[in-house]
């Protein structure tokens, strides 16, 4: 007997199942109970509730509907295989074989054009998979189409795609028969199965004694027919969560309505019959001419299409008994009001049909201002949504001591996009406000890095082996462990790979395979050769076979190079081995071999690696089962594996005890005291999934067809019904960039509208309906602040935050932050090394952070370039020019230096490197000639100088008889001049009587004349004073910007500063040009040390820079004689 139990509470239906199991024991104690479910989460919940009732839940099978129906086919009908030859995966592989054979037919012209240029069979496999997916749906929802197609006939009224789908299906059936596989599939078994059961006078052997169907929102029509036929022989209890106690489906015709009017539902607890309609006499007025019911409740009408179709299909079953197990909902708060309206099929919304109704609001229901059973929260970002949720959950737990974390479920439209924010907020909360939580339904690929690493390894034949991509593999601990590379070792390797010139490509063969010219440099083989040479010899000994040894890879940590070489050897072996197409059976052991070659599993990764191997073997087994005989490229298997790992969801922690956080998915109507919905944004939910262009079902839909949009609408309805105490909804209602308004999901808006149209706040009785509706909406919707540290979040109320870490920022109460720069007392030491002064005056602001605060913002660049050098600029060019210039000045062999740079891979390849070198040689030679012309034998001068109460000590290198001579391969800059000025003052104060010169590129020069010792000490004393001030607070000396101002305002002929308006305006322009830079030249204001002091250059800051620059830089311009 098929019995359909209707109830608005899933827990009541589950209690009914417990009652039946306890009262009607199975004859065979070893026979398992059979409970059909649609998800593992529902199975887990049922196991938990059953174990609470009986103390144990064992010997229970939880099959999915499709597998259960096929199992029944196997048990009832002879010669039916345990697995269908027409499952989706098997059909995909068979279509891979069939499609190329059919493409020359006229019906397949469109597909023939699509499959051109498909050397790797990727398009063919994707098309086969999509077609197989469609056929799989047709087997369930359109079996009559397939029956006609098998006879060679077309179905009237279908789209153009039928022209190729019909012969393709027929060919698929015939090909399956040719393979020696049964031609049976679900479409041609339903009727045979039903007829066999209908004609059987006794129960066929092997059938279960009874079957429960629990928590399934909808079943396809053919499944219901099959279950009805089974119900003739066994007990089938279909437990349906029905949000409404009255019939709210459609009808076929007046006769169907007459049949419904004669039907009664028996109350499951009381011996009485209940009608299907509230008003049976006027039931005919509920339906239009097409048989569609004007559902009384607007929310049920909008969200319930899936359930409405299912109600219709259930009512169409002939031999079934319906039982009523509805539980009255006491309308004692807003949530229960809405649930009651849906249950009773009532519409309490007052839209103001006439002026009298519109003018007052007291014909609505009053809403308690303290009622928080339904709340709407508007946030600016997913991060704020989760932060607000965490605070609100803490408030709920504080308010209700009986509430526990396991009573709360949080559902998100896309759990993968919210997981990082959930882990950041929930996972980082301190112990005093930590909420235990469990995230379910994440994609398997995001659950463990091993999965993503394995997919990357399967891409080796197509890889360019970019340095960052290879090193990223070593970020996976179990892969690094396989090659004995620790986290510290990886830091060394990252530095070595960068400095040894590795950019991309395993070796020259790999480069040629990519149809690019091989250079012999910048590949992994080139870099490894440099590292291994560095272990054997020093770079000072010269290059070996045009390769320069890399010195850093020597010593005790040199074994790292060997480990890296082992990894690269394996990568190269597998790159070659995976490149060729193979028959499927030869691909079978590849997965296990690769896992063994690249990973050293631990307890945490064992499950992930098992999942990889299971899915790989399943793909291969399906293809072999379909007897696919052609060679298969790796890319096809890789894409299929990646897709399956994306679809695989990690759900084993659902209902584990903490706050349950999961995705909104079917059959999640498990009752919870608190139901929270996040990310309910317009355009995000209901989720959009456009049907395929050749999906004939979408072109001609029928009642009972599944639609992602209808499913999501019904999910929202189920979430509302399953909430027992509170329904919490949040969405991103404001832009985080400009605070502009964004809209919620249409489902949320419909709920808000219905509440506003059916409720009013006390005191609003005299307002018209629109005004009271607006006030209700404003009352229920809480707009949260953009930032968590806003002072509003720490006032009593629904926005109150528990996050103590933001309290110091919020307690400023809107006041501006105190100034970052606060003077620190600094006492000059008795002795100051000259090197310290030089370091300070090279960049006074940076020196304050580094030397005084011990703070360094300049982290080393961790990103390794992914291309070889084509041009050299910036630091690389300066470093080469520095060595080249010194070599030319010393009149060494520049050609030897060229060979050294080329052997290290520092130069562009081939003629480009030669051209670059020649250009630099010509420019540096001009500079070197100027230096050689003035150069004399020099010696180091010891400095021990008393000035301004301190002793300056150190050495001045290369002091010539006629003074100081310095050279740099850089352009003229004030910063370079300051360094020479400091040395010049020390030199003169120590008794030197020569001049100081600094030669720079493009005829740039700084030249200072001899100064008397007293005069030099005077200026040196100023610099020491500047050092003292700069170690107490940042000294705003910006040499280039301030120097540009001084250069414009200083009149060298009259030794005066010009301050007329015209000159000051020009000086300001020059200052800003140097500070801001342009497209070609980086401005001084981009310096991170200055940006830490101020976000924007204010007039006050600019005035301070000019003042300090004039104080310390003016002597440079006054004494410069270049």
Swiss-Prot record:
One of its GO terms (biological process) is double-strand break repair via homologous recombination. Changing residue 134 to A: Acts at variant Chi sequences. Keywords: ATP-binding, DNA damage, DNA repair, DNA-binding, Exonuclease, Helicase, Hydrolase, Nuclease, Nucleotide-binding. It holds the Pfam family Exonuc_V_gamma. SUPFAM superfamilies: P-loop containing nucleoside triphosphate hydrolases, Restriction endonuclease-like. The keyword ATP-binding applies. In the RecBCD complex, RecB has a slow 3'-5' helicase, an exonuclease activity and loads RecA onto ssDNA, RecD has a fast 5'-3' helicase activity while RecC stimulates the ATPase and processivity of the RecB helicase and contributes to recognition of the Chi site. Belongs to the RecC family. This is RecBCD enzyme subunit RecC. It comes from Escherichia coli (strain K12). The gene is recC.
């Amino acid at each position: 007997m098929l019995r359909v139990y209707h109830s608005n509470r899933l827990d009541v239906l589950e209690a009914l199942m417990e009652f039946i199991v306890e009262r009607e024991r199975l004859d065979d104690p070893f026979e398992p109970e059979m409970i059909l479910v649609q998800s593992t989460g529902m199975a887990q919940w049922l196991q938990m509730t059953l174990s609470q009732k009986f103390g144990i839940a064992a010997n229970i099978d939880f099959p999915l509907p499709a597998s259960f129906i096929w199992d029944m086919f196997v048990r009832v009908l002879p010669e039916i295989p345990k697995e269908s030859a027409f499952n989706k995966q098997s059909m995909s592989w068979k279509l891979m074989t069939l499609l190329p054979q059919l493409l020359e037919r006229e019906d397949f012209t469109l597909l023939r054009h699509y499959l051109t240029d498909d050397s790797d069979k990727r398009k063919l496999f994707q098309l086969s998979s999509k077609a197989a997916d469609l056929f799989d749906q047709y087997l369930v929802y359109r079996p009559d189409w397939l029956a006609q197609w098998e006879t060679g006939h077309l179905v009237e009224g279908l789209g153009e795609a039928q022209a190729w789908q019909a012969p393709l299906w027929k060919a698929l059936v015939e090909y399956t028969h040719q393979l020696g596989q049964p031609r049976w599939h679900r479409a041609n078994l339903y009727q045979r199965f039903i007829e066999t059961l209908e004609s059987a006078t006794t129960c066929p052997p092997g059938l279960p004694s009874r079957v429960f169907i629990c928590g399934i929102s909808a079943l396809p029509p053919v499944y219901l027919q099959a279950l009805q036929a089974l119900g003739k022989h066994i007990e089938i209890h279909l437990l349906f969560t029905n949000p409404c106690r009255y019939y709210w489906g459609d009808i076929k015709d007046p006769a169907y309505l007459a049949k419904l009017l004669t039907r009664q539902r028996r109350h499951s607890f009381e011996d009485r019959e209940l009608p299907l309609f509230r008003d049976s006499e006027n039931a005919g007025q509920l339906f239009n001419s097409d048989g569609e019911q004007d559902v009384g409740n607007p929310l049920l009408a909008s969200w319930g299409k899936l359930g409405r179709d299912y109600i219709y299909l259930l009512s169409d079953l002939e031999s079934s008994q319906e039982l009523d197990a509805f539980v009255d909902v006491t309308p004692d708060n807003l949530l229960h009001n809405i649930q009651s309206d849906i249950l009773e099929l009532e519409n309490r919304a007052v839209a103001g049909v006439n002026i009298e109704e519109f003018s007052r609001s007291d014909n609505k229901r009053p809403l308690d201002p303290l009622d928080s059973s339904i709340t709407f929260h508007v946030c600016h970002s997913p991060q704020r949504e989760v932060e607000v949720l965490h605070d609100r959950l803490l408030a709920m737990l504080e308010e209700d001591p009986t509430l526990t974390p396991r009573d709360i479920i949080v559902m998100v439209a896309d759990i993968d996009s919210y997981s990082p924010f959930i882990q950041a907020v929930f996972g980082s909360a301190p112990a005093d406000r930590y909420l235990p939580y469990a995230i379910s339904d994440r994609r398997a690929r995001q659950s463990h890095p091993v999965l993503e690493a394995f997919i990357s390894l399967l891409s080796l034949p197509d890889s360019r082996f970019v340095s960052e991509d290879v090193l990223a593999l070593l970020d996976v601990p179990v892969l690094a462990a396989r090659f004995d590379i620790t986290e510290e070792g990886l830091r060394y390797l990252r530095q070595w790979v960068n400095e040894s010139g590795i950019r991309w490509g395993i070796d020259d063969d790999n480069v040629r395979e990519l149809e690019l010219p091989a250079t012999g440099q910048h590949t992994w083989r080139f870099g490894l050769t440099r590292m291994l040479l560095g272990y054997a010899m020093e770079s000072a000994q010269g290059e070996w076979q045009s390769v320069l040894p890399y010195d850093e890879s020597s010593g005790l940590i040199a074994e790292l190079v060997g480990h890296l070489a082992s990894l690269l050897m394996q990568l190269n072996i597998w790159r070659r081995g995976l490149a060729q197409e193979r028959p499927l059976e030869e691909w079978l052991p590849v997965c296990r071999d690769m896992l063994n070659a690249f990973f050293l599993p631990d307890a945490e990764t064992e499950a992930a690696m098992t999942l990889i191997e299971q899915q790989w073997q399943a793909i291969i087994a399906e293809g072999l089962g379909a007897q696919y005989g052609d060679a298969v490229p790796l890319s096809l298997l890789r894409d299929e594996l990646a897709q399956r790992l994306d679809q695989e969801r990690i759900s084993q922690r659902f209902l584990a005890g903490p706050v349950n956080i999961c995705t909104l998915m079917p059959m999640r109507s498990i009752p919870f005291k608190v139901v929270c919905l996040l990310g309910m944004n317009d355009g995000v939910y209901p989720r959009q999934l456009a049907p395929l262009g050749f999906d004939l079902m979408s072109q001609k839909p029928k009642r009972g067809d599944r639609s992602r949009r209808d499913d999501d609408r019904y999910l929202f309805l189920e979430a509302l019904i399953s909430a027992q105490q509170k329904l919490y909804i949040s969405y991103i209602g404001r832009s985080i960039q400009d605070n502009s308004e964004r809209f919620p999901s249409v489902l949320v808006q419909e709920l808000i509208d219905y509440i506003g149209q059916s409720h009013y706040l006390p005191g609003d009785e005299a307002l018209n309906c629109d005004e009271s509706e607006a006030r209700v909406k404003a009352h229920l919707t809480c707009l949260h602040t953009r930032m968590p540290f806003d002072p509003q979040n720490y006032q009593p109320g629904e926005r109150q935050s528990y996050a103590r870490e933001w309290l110091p920022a919020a307690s400023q109460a809107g006041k501006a932050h105190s100034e970052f720069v606060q003077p620190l007392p600094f006492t000059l030491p008795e002795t100051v090394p000259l090197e310290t002064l030089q370091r300070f005056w090279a960049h006074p602001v940076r020196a304050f952070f580094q030397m005084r605060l011990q703070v360094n913002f300049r982290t080393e660049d961790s990103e390794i370039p992914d291309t070889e050098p084509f041009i050299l600029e910036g630091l690389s060019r300066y470093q080469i020019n520095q060595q080249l210039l010194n070599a030319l000045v010393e009149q060494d062999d520049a050609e030897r230096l060229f060979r050294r740079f080329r052997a290290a891979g520092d130069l562009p390849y081939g003629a480009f490197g030669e051209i670059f070198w020649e250009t630099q040689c010509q420019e540096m030679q001009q500079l070197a000639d100027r230096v050689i012309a003035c150069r004399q034998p020099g010696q180091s001068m010891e400095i021990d100088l008393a000035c301004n109460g301190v002793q300056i000590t150190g050495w001045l290198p290369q002091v010539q008889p006629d003074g100081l001579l310095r050279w740099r391969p850089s352009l003229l800059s004030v910063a370079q001049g300051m360094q020479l000025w400091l040395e010049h003052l020390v030199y003169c104060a120590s008794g030197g009587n020569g001049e100081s010169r600094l030669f720079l590129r493009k005829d740039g020069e700084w030249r200072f004349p001899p100064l008397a010792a007293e005069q030099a000490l005077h200026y040196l004393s100023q610099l020491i004073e500047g050092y003292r001030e700069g170690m107490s607070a940042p000294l705003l000396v910006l040499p280039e910007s301030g120097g540009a101002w001084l250069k414009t305002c200083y009149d060298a002929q009259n030794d005066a500063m010009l301050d007329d308006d015209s000159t000051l305006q020009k000086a300001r322009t020059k200052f800003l040009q140097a500070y801001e830079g342009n497209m070609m030249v980086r401005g001084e204001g981009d310096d991170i040390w200055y940006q830490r002091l101020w976000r924007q250059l204010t007039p006050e800051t600019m005035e301070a820079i000019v003042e300090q620059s004039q104080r310390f830089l003016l002597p440079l311009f006054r004494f410069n004689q270049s």
